Amino acid sequence: MNESTPNPLIASRFRGFLPVIVDVETGGINAQTDALLEIAAVMVRMDWQGYLRPVGTLAHHVQPFPGARLDPASMAVNGIDPDHPFRFAVPESEALDAIFREVRREIREVANVSWGQRWG
């Protein structure tokens, strides 16, 4: 079994949940008023030594929603220019849909391999 094949130990370590590492950059700390500017998710699998290894990364620059607040202090920390022409940002819903679609695909793949190992 290679490192990209799911290890059944991951289910016991994470109580059946698939760990996904998520990082976001925002225009502030209030989810109701401040913009989501970047999101990234890293899918991981556990190797046979019990170490988590990245197997896929998905990242998007996100367009601030209409009326979103961009706190100057937050923008100074993250250094993001939301108007940069090479950002190629997508709407928040598109970015989140893409991330969730990949997570669901990964869950199905892990479940199928785990199910198949019972019969293998």
Regions found by a protein language model. Give the residues of each.
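Conserved non-catalytic scaffold segment of RNase H-like nuclease domains
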Residues: 2-120
